[in-house]
Structure formats: C-alpha cells, structure tokens
C-alpha cells in the first residue's frame, strides 16, 4: 500500500505531458534510429542517447521562429528536456548486460588457439632455418631477408578471428537519468503511425462498401462485376501458365533424354516481385553425359592438332627455302675457293719444276754414263715420234 501511494505521489508531482512534449516525443520516436531486442521476456525498441540528441538538434525546434527563441540551442538543453520526458515515462533507462559463454566453450577455444599458435610457431621455425641456409649461400640477399622478417614480426602471430556480434540483454537501470553518450533507453511511448491509421481506415471503408453492394447503382455493380471477372481470368491465366511451363519442361526433358533443361518464365512461382516474376523470359541448361563432352573435347583437340600441323608445315617450308638460299650462297663461295686452290696447285708445280731444273744444273758433274745414255735414248725416241706424226698427214693427203 505504501509503494502505491508513493507511485501516485510521483505521478501527481510529474503531471501529465503537454502537447509540445508529446509532439517532441512523437518526432523522436519515428525519426531517431532504433533497434529491437528482448527485455524481461518482452520485445522492446531501444535507442542510444547521443543519437537522440543529434536528432533533436536537427529538428524544427532547434530553429528560432519569429518572436520566439529556439527550444534546443545546445546539447545540454536537449539533455535537460529529455530528462523531463524520462520523468514523464516516455522512455526509461536500461542497462546492457553481455551474455557470457559457458566454460566448456571458452576452454575449447583456448585449446584451439594454443594448437594453432603451436603449428604456426613450427612453420615459422622451419621457414627461419631454410632462410638461414639460403643466407649462407647467398650473402647478397641478406638485406631482403631481414626486411621480410621485420614485416613478419610486425604482423600478429595468431590469425585474426572473425568479428562476431556479442549477444546481450537489457535490464532496468537503478539510476533513471538521461545522460549524453552511449547509454541505452527503452521506449515506453508507442503512438500509432499515420500510415497505419490511414491503411486501417481504408480497409474499414472497403468492408462497409462491400456489404452495401446490393444498394449500389446498376452501372457500378456491372463495372465491379467485369472487374472481378477480369481479375479472376488473370489469376487463372497465371495458374495455367505455371502448369503449361511444367508440361513443356517435361516434353523437352523426355525428348532429349534429360540432357536439355528448358524453363519458360523460371521466376513465375518464385518469391519475387510482380515484375521480376516475368524476368527472364526463359532459361536453358545442358546436362548431358560425360561421353558427349569427351567426344567434343577430342574433336576440338583434333582440330587443334591439324591446325598445329599446318602451321608446322608452313614453318618447315620456310626453313627449306632459307636452307636453299644459304646453299647457293655457300656453293658460290666454294667455287671461288676452288679456283684459288687450282691457282695455288699450278704455282706449286712450276716451283717444283724450277727446283728440279736448278737441281739438274747444279748436279751436272755428278751424272753417270748410264744416265747420259738413257737421256740420249729418250731423246731419240721423241724424234722418231715426231717424224711419225709428220709422215701420217702426208699419207692421208695422198
């Protein structure tokens, strides 16, 4: 009983909110960025204090009107006004409590981290040993190796863990004060948005109009009848299209033995918008056996081989032509070389004869009688041959 009396006294002291306060709270409710979470088993919306202050400083109440001062001039004035809203129970302060993981999961994560760090250290030791061997053989690359080691030392040894959002829950805060910062405040004030109000009003009017259909004029009833028939035909045509596309797919699939998958309007029954359900017009996929693919690959490889052989034959022809031109050039050089050799041979023979003649002149005194007789006999034989040659043409003339 005492607590209820205290609560009533607080309400009386605070009083009911004014129109201006309701307008500010409504603006803040629909324009300040909010998030939803669970609190005490209920789904609630919450906002952050600093974002609420920024939102109100950008509002129309932060601009001075003619003959009136601006309601919000500084961040402190916004904080004071939000304290008033908090006291009038538009929202209340909450405490963000992070959910702790069980001990088993933490132990497993630590063990995994240790195992990964041990493997990385082993890999690093192997890499360092290989680097030391290379540095001994190649002294010039020591500077590059030191730079790479410095870069590796700068990077952390363990791999970066994936950033995961930590789960938390909200609990009511003991100190109900509005503070500018990252403090969390849960909304209590939940007014009806104008859009939801308008949609509900239109729905109610439509239901009332449908119930009063017999009282409509004849022209309106005929028009509504044709509209309903058109809508029914449209829905029926979509259903028929869905069935027809399945039948077409089955026919093509059976004829081709399951190799061709053809879909007409593939997104017709998909969870997409009205326009996207008619895009694309069709899709086609080939899912044939591997043998056909191998045959195609073989045919392509044969074509490539033929093309390569033709290129090789062309290159060989070019090489033969180049070889012929080189042979003709070499033959010309060899002919000139042969003439030179013949000239040198004739010169050598003349030199030998001159030497022989000079030798005979020098060794004249040393010739024996037998050699003189042989020379005289040879001279006689030569004279006889000359006479025979002279006598032969005379006989021929006679």
From Swiss-Prot:
One of its GO terms (cellular component) is endoplasmic reticulum membrane. Its main location: endoplasmic reticulum. The keyword Nucleus does not apply. It holds the Pfam family Sec62. InterPro entries: Sec62. It is found in: Endoplasmic reticulum membrane. Keywords: Endoplasmic reticulum, Membrane, Protein transport, Translocation, Transmembrane, Transmembrane helix, Transport. Residues 218-234 are lumenal. The chain crosses the membrane at residues 197-217, 235-255. GO terms for biological process: post-translational protein targeting to membrane, translocation. Residues 1-196, 256-398 are cytoplasmic. Residues 373-389 have a biased composition (Acidic residues). Residues 101-167, 289-398 are annotated as: Disordered. It comes from the Eukaryota. Residues 101-155, 289-327, 337-355 have a biased composition (Basic and acidic residues). PANTHER family: TRANSLOCATION PROTEIN SEC62. Required for preprotein translocation. Belongs to the SEC62 family. Part of a complex that contains SEC61, SEC62 and SEC63. This is Translocation protein SEC62. It comes from Gallus gallus (Chicken). The gene is SEC62.
């Amino acid at each position: 009983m005492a607590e209820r009396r205290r609560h009533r006294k607080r309400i009386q002291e605070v009083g009911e909110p004014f129109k201006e306060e309701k307008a500010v709270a409504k603006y803040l409710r629909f324009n300040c960025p909010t998030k939803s979470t669970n609190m005490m088993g209920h789904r609630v919306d919450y906002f952050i204090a600093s974002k609420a202050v920024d939102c109100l400083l950008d509002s129309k109440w932060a601009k001075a009107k003619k003959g009136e001062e601006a309601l919000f001039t500084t961040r402190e004035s916004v904080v004071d006004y939000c304290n008033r809203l908090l006291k009038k129970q538009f929202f209340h302060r909450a405490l963000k409590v992070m959910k702790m993981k069980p001990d088993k999961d933490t132990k497993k994560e630590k063990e995994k981290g240790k195992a990964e760090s041990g493997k990385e250290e082993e890999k690093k030791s192997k890499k360092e040993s290989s680097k030391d061997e290379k540095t001994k053989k190649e002294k010039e690359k020591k500077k590059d190796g030191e730079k790479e080691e410095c870069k590796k030392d700068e990077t952390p040894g363990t791999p970066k863990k994936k950033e995961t959002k930590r789960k938390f829950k909200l609990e009511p805060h003991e100190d109900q004060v509005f503070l500018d910062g990252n403090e969390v405040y849960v909304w209590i004030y939940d007014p009806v948005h104008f859009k939801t109000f308008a949609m509900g009003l239109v729905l109610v009017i439509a239901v009332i109009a449908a119930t009063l259909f017999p009282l409509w004029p004849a022209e309106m009833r005929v028009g509504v009848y044709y509209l309903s028939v058109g809508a029914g035909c449209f829905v029926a045509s979509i259903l028929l299209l869905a069935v027809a596309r399945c039948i077409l797919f089955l026919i093509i699939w059976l004829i081709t033995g399951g190799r061709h998958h053809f879909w007409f309007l593939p997104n017709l029954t998909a969870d997409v918008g009205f326009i996207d359900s008619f895009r694309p017009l069709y899709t086609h996929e080939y899912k044939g056996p591997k043998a056909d693919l191998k045959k195609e690959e073989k045919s392509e490889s044969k074509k490539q081989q033929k093309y390569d052989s033709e290129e090789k034959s062309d290159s060989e022809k070019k090489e033969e032509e180049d070889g012929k031109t080189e042979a003709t050039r070499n033959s010309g050089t060899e002919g000139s070389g042969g003439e030179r050799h013949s000239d040198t041979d004739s010169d050598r023979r003349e030199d030998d004869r001159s030497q022989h003649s000079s030798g005979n002149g020098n060794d004249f005194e040393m010739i024996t009688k037998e050699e003189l007789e042989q020379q005289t006999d040879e001279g006689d034989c030569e004279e006889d041959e000359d006479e025979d040659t002279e006598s032969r043409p005379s006989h021929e003339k006679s």
